[in-house]
UniProtKB/Swiss-Prot annotation:
Species this protein is from: Saccharomyces cerevisiae (strain ATCC 204508 / S288c)
Start-end of Basic and acidic residues biased regions: 111-121
Complex and partners: Component of the inner kinetochore constitutive centromere-associated network (CCAN) (also known as central kinetochore CTF19 complex in yeast), which is composed of at least AME1, CHL4, CNN1, CTF3, CTF19, IML3, MCM16, MCM21, MCM22, MHF1, MHF2, MIF2, NKP1, NKP2, OKP1 and WIP1. Interacts (via N-terminus) with the outer kinetochore NDC80 complex subunits SPC24 (via C-terminus) and SPC25 (via C-terminus); the interaction is direct and contributes to the correct spatiotemporal organization of the KMN network. Interacts with outer kinetochore MIS12 complex subunit NNF1.
Higher taxonomy: Eukaryota, Fungi, Dikarya, Ascomycota, Saccharomycotina
Biased composition range(s): Polar residues: 122-132
Keywords tagged on the record: Cell cycle, Cell division, Centromere, Chromosome, Kinetochore, Mitosis, Nucleus, Phosphoprotein
Protein name as it appears in the record: Inner kinetochore subunit CNN1
């Protein structure tokens, strides 16, 4: 390698050294080749360097040159934006470091400001004007301290639990003469225990008429011709009152055991299905479909079961498979024998399914 030589110059104190070395010459040659490649691949840039006309005159001549110039411009702007992103990231990192350092030193300053604000609040209790604080933290801590001093204790009255006073009207309702016990039919006596099982630990909203069963319960017979007229009159009165009740009293009717026995009193010749039996028959279907029926709905289903019981009473001993299927089809419950089997599978437990399958299918 040749010895580096310094180019002759008039000013020896120039900042830029002009010592020519092989490495410097090689770098200059590479830069020149890169510039040539750039000019060769960008006709718009080459046109700007070679032509002496103005830029807007060049752009107005050829649309291809305008397009290439815009592409070059977009590339330059993209590179510049990337450079700006790196600078912004560095700036954000620097700001984050400054914030962390400020937060580390902040607790000590807050303690000093808090002690200073406490002293200022103690000195300015009698003054109506608030002191001028130098920072936002002083103002916040001063207000918090003043608010803590203004807390008040609230007095709570004691709770006294007392018994509900009983009136003489309720005592009068529980006393009945022996003659009243004779007016209770056997159907009501049979249906009342099942309804009572459905309403365990649920006090009625309305005051139901208590049914007192005295020692004369044993000699009661099923046929009481002297009381048939009274029972029909009571049934008609209960039906009339049930139809005239508003929506607000539906919950009271559902909790009233006397009102739930309307099907048994109205059609005493046919014994309806008990609510417990209905729940047992429909338990599987209701659990699979997650259906919860209210009490009033069960009483309605019990009333509708009288139609089926009446039909079975008329056809008892002579009921055939086809007649049963036809009757269910006429009611609109099923369409064919397969639907009846599916209905029995949904509503009946496994033991009853096997029994009805051996009889019908």
């Amino acid at each position: 390698m040749s010895t580096p030589r310094k180019a002759a110059g008039n000013n020896e104190n120039t900042e830029v050294s002009e010592i020519r070395t092989p490495f410097r010459e090689r770098a200059l040659e590479e830069q020149r080749l890169k510039d040539e490649v750039l000019i060769r691949n960008t006709p718009g840039y080459r046109k700007l360097l070679s032509a002496s006309t103005k830029s807007h005159d060049i752009l107005n001549k050829d649309p291809n040159e305008v397009r290439s110039f815009l592409q070059d411009l977009s590339q330059v702007l993209a590179r510049k934006s990337q450079g700006n992103d790196t600078t912004t990231n560095k700036t954000q990192a620097r700001n984050l470091i400054d914030e962390l350092a400020y937060e580390e030193s902040q607790p000590e300053e807050n303690e000093l400001l808090r002690s200073r604000s406490e002293k200022l609040t103690d000195n300015n209790i009698g003054n109506e004007t608030q002191p001028d604080y130098t920072s936002l933290s002083q103002t916040v801590f001063a207000k918090l301290q003043e608010r803590d001093k203004g807390l008040k204790s609230r007095k709570i009255d004691p709770i006294i639990i007392q018994d509900v006073p009983t009136t003489g009207h309720e005592d009068e309702l529980t006393v009945h003469s022996p003659d009243k016990a004779n007016s209770i039919s056997m159907e009501v006596l049979r249906t009342s225990p099942s309804i009572g099982m459905d309403q365990v630990d649920e006090p009625p909203v309305r005051d139901p008429v208590p049914i007192s069963i005295t020692q004369q319960e044993e000699p009661l017979s099923e046929d009481l011709p002297s009381d048939d007229k009274e029972e029909t009159e009571e049934a008609e009165n209960e039906d009339y009152s049930f139809e005239n009740t508003s929506d607000e009293n539906l919950d009271d009717i559902g909790n009233d055991p006397i009102r739930l026995n309307v099907p048994a009193v109205r059609r005493s010749s046919i014994k309806p299905l008990q609510i417990m039996d209905l729940k047992h028959l429909t338990r599987q279907f209701l659990n699979e479909n997650r259906i919860i029926l209210p009490k009033q709905t069960w009483s309605t289903i019990q009333e509708e079961s009288l139609n089926i019981m009446d039909f079975l009473k008329q056809k008892i001993g002579t009921l055939q498979k086809q007649e049963l299927v036809d009757s269910f089809i006429d009611m609109g419950i099923i369409n064919n024998v397969d639907d009846m089997f599916e209905l029995a599978h949904e509503l009946l437990p496994l033991e009853l399914q096997s029994r009805i399958e051996s009889y019908l299918f």
